[in-house]
Structures are given as structure tokens and as C-alpha cells.
């Protein structure tokens, strides 16, 4: 079966998604992409999991979906996924979330929706990065100055130097990005009651392995799998091993 591209209206916004039909008796796989990415990134993985019905969405602001109709918070993205599941009447859903998509998966799974049966977090974000004291001081000093129009180019250089390329990549989503990264999901992890698989790249620099271990300890029914010779996009670096772990867990 081919992967079909479709659209749906959710909360007044067009949401683009990709769908491949599989065994109707098997669990449904719902893939959530990371920041600056889109649903297409999962197509190779979906192709290797052809026995399952699979969906991958473009979050509002990414891919071919509409921009958010306001400055989104993580809860808004969680509601988009929840409404997507309801509108398509999906049951026995397994969410597979990468990076930012993992954040959304954590947020939704912590509310124990009956439609979700399992959760797979892939190099997931969600543990808030702790700024060191120097960065906090610098931020307090330069934030008011940054607002001056003639310092726009300087602002971009400093943001890049501080590792905030995601902030610059999607200017329409800058406040949304700030809302997202400022939310620490640590307190939600113990509320996840469904079986959870953590798949992590051994050399992930964006979501360090220490975050994976924190999540494994906090989520009651969880297991961590570390893929060697992989980075933040472990499912791209080692697709075959990634897919094999999915099949074992599902």
C-alpha cells in the first residue's frame, strides 16, 4: 500500500498528514515529528512497518499545515493530536514522538486518554535545560537591549552562539518556541501509566542520554534502548535497528 497525503481541519486550522493502511486488527501507529521537521521524515520508517496502519502529521507551523492561529503552548499541540485521534476515530494508538514530538506525546499520555495503548519516545525533549548562572545574568542584561531594532543582526548572532538556531529558523513561531522550551515535563513523567519505550541515540547532543535515564527512572512502566553510533535522529541513522525495536515493543 502507498502512503497517502491527506488534510483535515482541526480547531480551525488545516492539518496535513500522511497515512498508510495496514492490518486493521493491529495497533495504530501515530508518528510525531520534531521541531523544524515534518511528517515526511517518518516515511522510510512507515514503509518498514507496512503491517501497521500508520499516520504522521505535520504540526501546525510545519510542513504543509497552517501556521498556528495564536502563539501555541505545548497544551495546544497536545490538543491537536487528541482531536486528530478523535476525528479519525482511532483506537489502540501507539504514539511515536521524536524530540519535540516526544514532548507532545508526554503531555498527552500523562492525561491517560483511553485511545492510547503505548508510548514510544525517540530522543525526546522534555527535561528542561538548566541555564548556568552566567547565562542567566547575561540574559537579564541583554534582553531589554535586544528589543532595540538596530540590534537585530547582533541579536541573531548571539542567539546562534547560544545554541538557539531553532529560535531563528521559524520566525513566525518564536514565541511558541519559547513557550515550548520553558515547560519542564519532569513532573508529568510519573503520570504516564501506559507501557513506554525510550529509544535514544548514544551520541545525541540535543537530548543527552542523561535525559533518557531521567525519563526511564520517572516513567513507571518504561524501558530504555540505546542505539550505538547514532545521534539525535537515531531513527534515520539506524533505521533497521530502530524498526526492529519498534516491532518487539508493539
Which ranges hold each PLM region?
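Conserved HGGG/HGGXW glycine-rich cap/lid loop of the alpha/beta-hydrolase fold
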Residues: 20-64
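Conserved alpha/beta-hydrolase "acid-adjacent" motif
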Residues: 205-211
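Flexible "cap/lid" loop of the alpha/beta hydrolase fold
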Residues: 103-111, 117-148
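Catalytic histidine-centered segment of alpha/beta-hydrolase-like enzymes
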Residues: 230-239
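Alpha/beta-hydrolase fold catalytic core
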Residues: 1-29, 50-52, 90-91, 132, ...
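Active-site loop/oxyanion-hole signature of alpha/beta-hydrolase fold enzymes
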Residues: 18, 55-96, 244
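Short beta-strand/loop motif that positions the catalytic acidic residue
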Residues: 192, 198-200, 204
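Hydrophobic, aromatic-rich cap/lid helix
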Residues: 159-187
Amino acid at each position: 500500500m502507498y502512503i497517502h497525503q491527506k488534510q483535515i481541519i482541526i480547531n480551525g486550522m488545516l492539518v496535513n498528514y500522511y497515512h498508510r493502511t495496514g492490518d486493521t486488527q493491529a495497533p495504530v501507529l501515530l508518528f510525531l515529528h520534531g521541531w523544524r521537521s515534518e511528517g515526511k521524515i517518518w516515511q522510510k520508517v512507515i514503509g518498514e512497518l507496512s503491517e501497521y496502519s500508520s499516520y504522521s502529521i505535520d504540526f501546525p507551523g510545519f510542513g504543509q499545515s497552517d501556521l498556528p492561529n495564536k502563539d501555541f503552548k505545548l497544551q495546544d499541540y497536545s490538543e491537536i493530536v487528541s482531536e486528530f485521534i478523535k476525528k479519525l476515530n482511532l483506537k489502540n494508538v501507539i504514539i511515536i514522538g521524536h524530540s519535540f514530538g516526544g514532548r507532545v506525546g508526554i503531555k498527552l499520555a500523562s492525561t491517560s486518554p483511553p485511545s492510547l495503548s503505548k508510548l514510544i519516545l525517540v530522543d525526546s525533549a522534555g527535561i528542561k535545560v538548566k541555564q548556568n548562572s552566567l547565562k542567566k545574568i547575561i540574559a537579564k542584561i541583554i534582553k531589554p537591549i535586544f528589543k532595540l531594532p538596530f540590534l537585530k543582526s547582533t541579536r541573531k548572532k548571539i542567539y546562534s552562539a547560544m545554541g538557539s538556531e531553532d529560535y531563528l529558523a521559524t520566525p513566525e513561531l518564536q514565541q511558541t518556541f519559547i513557550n515550548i522550551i520553558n515547560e519542564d515535563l519532569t513532573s508529568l513523567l510519573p503520570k504516564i501509566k501506559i507501557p513506554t519505550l525510550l529509544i535514544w541515540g548514544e551520541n545525541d547532543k540535543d537530548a543527552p542520554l542523561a535525559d533518557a535515564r531521567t525519563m526511564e527512572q520517572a516513567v513507571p512502566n518504561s524501558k530504555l534502548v540505546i542505539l550505538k553510533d547514532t545521534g539525535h535522529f537515531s531513527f534515520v541513522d539506524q533505521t533497521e535497528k530502530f524498526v526492529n525495536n519498534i516491532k518487539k515493543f508493539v
